[in-house]
């Protein structure tokens, strides 16, 4: 255990009874533990919620919190992390802009005795990542693919084949190449879609089916909208666009307007349950989204950090799936949930994630 971790562990053991999830009471510590939170962007609403949840939960447990957003600039995020280490934070929670760009700065953090938790996006290429907290990202992809198949009529509402032979024309989108999760989402989706593509039930008129061809740098909605516009030729000529595999809500909400002049709505998937997308789902426009309760993810992350700083072993439920190139990173995975027009109120409003007024 490093000198900094030893110091922090001693402080936290003194106040361990006060550091329970959801409890901010009890005597104050003489010296607060500190955490640096490095988030990738404010352009996606979900990351704003992530930052707010983390800051609130760490703060309620007596942590000094330093939080920075990098505005999708990998170099800026490296600088922000360097500054946090120089400030003397005891731990870092990082949602990476570029999963492979942090090796050097995290090596410096390790030398300074700083614990590191990779948050939602797996940091790759370096050994200086202690733990990973995320959702079952492959399952996200399979959910999106099955929702697409249900929406176009290949599967029924129970997930059973309808016998429809197609061919159903679809187009594929993936997330940013520098986000490890984007690859996992796409792999999960394609594992489901591949048999239907091979049998001809599904077809991709553009021919763009590899991750490299369908990736969206920076998860940019503008880039996705521009690409969708270039793909519309066959559909304006009479081929019906049955559906679009979209990896998140930002891209889904860019794709839908781009297809507006077709005169009908293709089935479009999403992820993150952002309010504009949920409103679109409620109106019957976007077909589905995948809900990931970032309150739970923040709670898991906070408990990981607390365990690390007190010398305890964080709880994990996956010790084999997430190899970042330097070794397997111990992981806690949460379960995502599909949201549709039929269940959005039960899933999102009844759980308290949103109010009825927010969704409208």
Please identify what each model-predicted range represents:
Residues 1-27:
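Secretory targeting and sorting signals
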Residues 3-4, 23-360:
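A residue-level marker of the well-folded mature domains of exported/periplasmic proteins
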């Amino acid at each position: 255990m490093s000198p900094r971790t030893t110091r922090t562990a001693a402080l936290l053991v003194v106040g361990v009874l006060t550091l329970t999830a959801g409890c901010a009471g009890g005597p104050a510590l003489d010296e607060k533990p500190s955490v640096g939170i490095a988030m990738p962007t404010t352009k996606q609403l979900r990351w704003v919620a992530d930052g707010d949840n983390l800051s609130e939960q760490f703060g309620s447990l007596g942590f000094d919190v330093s939080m920075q957003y990098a505005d999708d600039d990998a170099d800026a995020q490296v600088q922000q992390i360097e500054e946090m280490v120089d400030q003397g934070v005891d731990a870092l929670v990082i949602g990476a802009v570029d999963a492979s760009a942090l090796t050097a700065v995290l090596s410096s953090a390790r030398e300074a005795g700083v614990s590191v938790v990779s948050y939602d996006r797996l940091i790759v290429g370096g050994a200086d990542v202690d733990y990973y907290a995320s959702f079952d990202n492959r399952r996200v992809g399979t959910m999106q693919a099955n929702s697409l198949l249900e929406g176009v009529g290949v599967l029924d509402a129970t997930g059973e084949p309808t016998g429809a032979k197609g061919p159903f024309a679809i187009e594929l989108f993936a997330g940013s190449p520098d986000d490890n999760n984007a690859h996992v989402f796409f792999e999960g989706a394609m594992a489901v879609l591949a048999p239907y593509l091979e049998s001809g039930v599904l077809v991709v008129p553009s021919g763009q089916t590899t991750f490299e061809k369908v990736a969206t740098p920076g998860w940019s909605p503008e880039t996705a909208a521009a690409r969708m516009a270039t793909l519309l030729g066959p559909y304006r000529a009479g081929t019906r666009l049955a559906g679009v595999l979209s990896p998140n809500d930002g891209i889904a909400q860019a794709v839908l307007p781009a297809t507006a002049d077709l005169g009908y709505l293709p089935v479009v998937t999403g992820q993150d349950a952002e309010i504009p997308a949920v409103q679109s789902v409620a109106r019957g426009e976007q077909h589905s989204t995948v809900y990931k309760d970032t309150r739970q993810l923040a709670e898991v992350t906070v408990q990981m950090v607390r365990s690390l700083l007190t010398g305890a072993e964080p709880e994990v439920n996956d010790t084999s799936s997430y190899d970042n190139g330097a070794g397997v990173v111990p992981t806690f995975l949460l379960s995502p949930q599909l949201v549709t027009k039929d269940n959005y109120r039960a899933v999102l409003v009844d759980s308290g994630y949103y109010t009825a007024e927010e969704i409208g």
